[in-house]
């Protein structure tokens, strides 16, 4: 599968970009990305270019970013806007099915689209079939309802990329909403792009900026806090430790009909890894084997 992410400006061996590459391989042609200010904005969209690209059909991730403190709300707004558009389209389609003068073939395709409109698997194929059928119907007659349906039929999956600390209130609000959003957290355990300052993601005893004597408090258990809602899909992954579990967790999170949170261990330049970030995947493997990072 072709990744729809290329030529990033990340540090060589960055622990974050492999996850983005994988996600765009799986869902890139139908993704909406909400990205907060930070490393993942710097390496993905350093002016004048953006690292997200399109496939041979012109389909690719729709990317936007906001400030650190309001990115969950920003991404949630993207989701709600698209959800409203799709709900309106579904209503128009049902009106056409009930009383519209449409062919049996178009009727069948519309019914199939309505039945699977919230399923990621096969969505591109259903959209292509619907588009072709609508083009044929519009060639035969000028129908405003059919035109409205055709223009908006390519809105599918929503996704929110976000960070760990400053925007937690917004993240908590979005996860508590019960809506079908997906959150991927790159856990570098420090503020990476500003020089490696300690945060609530930093573990006890770690030496970082603002914690020169070792961090005194515990690391926030973000996964456990999300689990307390009872309806959030939560996974913790490390690509270097288990590619199979990483792929399985991301696929399941996207398919889950509700909020999902994936916490991805991401070795960083600020970790001072012996041998450099060329060993980042091996470092992730060691972290899991030592019990430092849990997979679930």
Tell me the role of every PLM-derived stretch.
Residues 2-10, 66-80, 84-101, 205-255:
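Conserved thiamine diphosphate
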Residues 126-129, 134, 158, 185-199, ...:
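Core alpha/beta catalytic barrel or barrel-like domain that forms the active/cofactor pocket
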Residues 173-201, 206-220, 240, 256, ...:
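Residues forming the flavin
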Residues 1-18, 22-25, 49, 74, ...:
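Flanking helices and flexible, charged tails adjoining ferredoxin-like Fe-S electron-transfer domains
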Residues 48-61, 246-296:
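Glycine/aspartate-rich loop-and-adjacent alpha/beta segment that forms the canonical ThDP
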Residues 16-22, 29-32, 42-54, 145-197, ...:
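Thiamine diphosphate
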Residues 68-152:
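N-terminal leader/propeptide and maturation segments of large enzyme subunits in energy/redox metabolism
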């Amino acid at each position: 599968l072709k990744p729809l992410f290329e030529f990033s400006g990340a540090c060589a061996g960055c622990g974050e970009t492999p996850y983005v590459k994988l996600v765009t391989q799986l869902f890139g042609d139908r993704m909406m990305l909400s990205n907060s200010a930070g490393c993942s904005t710097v390496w993905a969209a350093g002016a004048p270019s953006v690292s997200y690209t399109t496939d041979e059909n012109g389909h690719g991730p729709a990317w936007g970013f906001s400030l650190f403190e309001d990115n969950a709300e920003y991404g949630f707004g993207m989701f709600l806007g698209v959800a409203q558009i799709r709900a309106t389209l579904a209503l128009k389609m049902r009106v056409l099915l009930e009383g519209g003068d449409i062919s049996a073939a178009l009727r069948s395709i519309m019914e199939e689209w309505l039945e699977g409109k919230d399923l990621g698997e096969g969505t591109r194929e259903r959209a292509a079939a619907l588009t072709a059928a609508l083009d044929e119907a519009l060639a035969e007659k000028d129908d405003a309802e059919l035109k409205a349906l055709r223009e908006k039929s390519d809105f599918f999956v929503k996704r929110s990329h976000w960070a760990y600390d400053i925007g937690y209130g917004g993240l908590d609000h979005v996860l508590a909403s019960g809506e079908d959003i997906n959150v991927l957290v790159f856990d570098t355990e420090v503020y990476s792009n500003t020089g490696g300052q300690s945060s609530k993601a930093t573990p006890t005893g770690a030496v970082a900026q603002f914690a020169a004597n070792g961090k005194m408090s515990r690391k926030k258990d973000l996964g456990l806090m999300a689990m307390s809602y009872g309806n959030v899909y939560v996974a913790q992954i490390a690509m270097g430790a288990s590619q199979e579990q990483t792929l399985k967790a991301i696929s399941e999170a996207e398919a889950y009909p509700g909020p999902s949170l994936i916490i991805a261990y991401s070795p960083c330049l600020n970790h001072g890894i012996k041998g450099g970030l060329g060993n980042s995947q091996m470092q992730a493997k060691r972290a899991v084997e030592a019990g430092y990072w849990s997979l679930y």
